[in-house]
A protein has these predicted regions:
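Hydrophobic alpha-helical transmembrane segments of integral membrane proteins
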Residues: 126-127, 161-162, 182-183, 193, ...
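Hydrophobic transmembrane-helix bundles of small-molecule transporters
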Residues: 151, 173-284, 290, 308, ...
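12-transmembrane solute porter fold
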Residues: 21-46, 57, 226, 239-244, ...
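Membrane-water interface at transmembrane helix exits
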Residues: 83, 137, 199, 225-233, ...
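Transmembrane-helix bundle of Major Facilitator Superfamily
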Residues: 2-196, 328-330, 338-340, 344-352, ...
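Residue-level signal for the membrane-embedded core of alpha-helical transmembrane segments
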Residues: 73, 127, 219-222, 293
Length: 463
């Protein structure tokens, strides 16, 4: 009997552990799905929000970018705080803030209040994202299991970003725009309960906080983003545009200076000792610049160029949405066979092809041809899990929260600037006309640059 028990107990314990890991991953993924979905779900609701609450088109851009600017600029602090207080605690703090802010968004009575609570949503998302990566790395110690978990995490990101317009369109058409925020409340509560029961806490690691660096990072990103949005509303030579742009550049320079001189910088230079990590951080910036900007331009362009409402816009982007989800899942099987860098390069190359096709077919081609042109953009989701795996594998092992914060801050900063820059170019044609050609030509070029970086780094790693 003892031999029999010895034979079966490890198996039972293993099954229980696997079950607990699966539930922890479900909780992590549910929260992560909410924060990625909220980056794009609002795009198709902007017309309804404007009709209900009023506000200029440039203000509507801040409903999107208020979230992503706060998200991006606080990720570095949140990554450090995740190391200080433990990833599970950090995740639950972020989830609580995000759910409360979502409820506030649903009852907003003015655009100004909505932008303010969207910023609060971004604060919660900033806490949640690096903690989620650190929790996955801590929960799944075995490399193959971790790779599978990161593939799920990456797939959730791709599905959330791409399905935002469709989910938003359905909710706006059936219930109203406020429903896109209310849906986060029950999902967030369920995720918090699961995580508290099935995820172990990471070991807290105390270190001083770089508040001057954090404030400069927030100031720089907000003013640079505001400068691009102002350019679309008032022109490139307007006083407010120039003031915001110059402030952003000076703030960025001051941030670099502070980080080089402060004893405990917000971004520890040791994080960038590995060239692969530095490269994947740069590629992550370009990736989100292109993806967030593309989804924003497609959602706005389909409405203003083709006259589609929120629901029709969501369904129009369904081919891209389906391909995005499928590719994000498929990448988990492809990476073990080909390696991370080739998969990243393949996804980015497809993005360049798709952006070029949209630029050629966006304004005047048949709608069906335009929508088929978006499918290769969905294939870029191949790169998501591979990029994440590279970032977490090449970052410092004892600073996982900070490494995750740096990687995701770069991605979210790219997303915020992508919406601002490409959104401005979208509406800056003659007579303030809308054209998909200009923003998607820039997107294709940016994807091409990222392909070159990935290819060069891949070759260096094999020589």
């Amino acid at each position: 009997m003892e031999l029999l028990a010895a034979h079966f107990v490890p198996s039972t314990r293993s099954r229980r552990r696997s079950h607990g890991q699966a539930l922890a991953l479900a909780a992590i993924s549910a929260g992560f799905l909410m924060i990625t979905l909220d980056a794009t779900i609002v795009n198709v609701a902007l017309r309804g929000i404007g009709a209900d609450l009023g506000g200029a088109p440039s203000t509507a851009q801040w409903v999107v970018d208020g979230y992503t600017v706060a998200f991006a600029s606080l990720l570095l602090l949140a990554g450090s705080m995740s190391d200080r207080i433990g990833a599970r605690t950090g995740y639950l703090v972020g989830l609580t803030v995000f759910v409360l802010a979502s409820a506030a968004c649903a009852v907003a009575g003015s655009v100004a209040f909505l932008v303010a609570v969207r910023v609060a949503q971004g604060v919660g998302a900033a806490w949640l994202m690096p903690s989620s990566l650190a929790l996955i790395t801590h929960t799944f110690a075995e490399p193959q299991a971790r790779r599978r978990a990161l593939a799920v995490w990456g797939a959730v990101s791709g599905i959330g970003l791409a399905s935002g317009p469709l989910v938003g369109g359905i909710l706006v058409a059936s219930v109203g725009w406020r429903a896109i925020f209310l849906v986060n409340v029950p999902v967030g509560l369920a995720a918090a309960r699961l995580l508290a029961r099935h995820a172990d806490e990471t070991t807290p690691r105390r270190r001083p906080l770089d508040l001057p660096g954090q404030l400069l990072a927030m100031f720089s990103l907000a003013t640079l983003t505001g400068g691009f949005i102002s350019a679309g509303a008032h022109g490139w030579t307007a006083g407010v545009t120039l003031a915001l742009g110059i402030s952003g550049v000076l703030g960025s320079a001051a941030f670099v200076l502070v980080e080089r001189t402060v004893r405990r910088p917000l971004i520890d230079p040791d994080v960038f000792r590995d060239k692969a990590f530095t490269t994947v951080v740069a590629i992550g910036f370009v990736f989100n610049f292109c993806l967030y900007g593309s989804i924003f331009c497609l959602a706005v362009g389909l409405g203003r160029l083709r006259g589609l409402d929120a629901l029709d816009t969501g369904f129009a982007l369904l081919p891209m949405t389906v391909v995005t989800g499928a590719m994000a899942l498929f990448a988990g099987r492809l990476v073990p066979r080909l390696g991370e860098w080739p998969v990243v390069a393949a996804g980015l190359t497809s993005g360049a092809v798709g952006a070029t096709l949209v630029a050629l077919n966006g304004s005047h081609a048949h709608l069906a041809l335009l929508l088929l042109s978006t499918v290769p953009i969905g294939v870029t989701a191949l790169a998501m899990p591979a990029m994440t795996g590279l970032a977490m594998a090449s970052g410092p092992r004892l600073r996982l929260g900070l490494a995750a914060g740096v990687f995701n801050a770069s991605r979210q900063a790219g997303g915020a600037l992508g919406v601002a820059v490409l959104g401005t170019i979208l509406t800056s044609g003659p007579g303030a006309s809308v054209s998909l050609r200009r923003p998607f030509l820039l997107t294709a070029g940016a994807y091409g640059l990222a392909v070159a970086l990935a290819t060069l780094t891949s070759h260096e790693g094999t020589t």
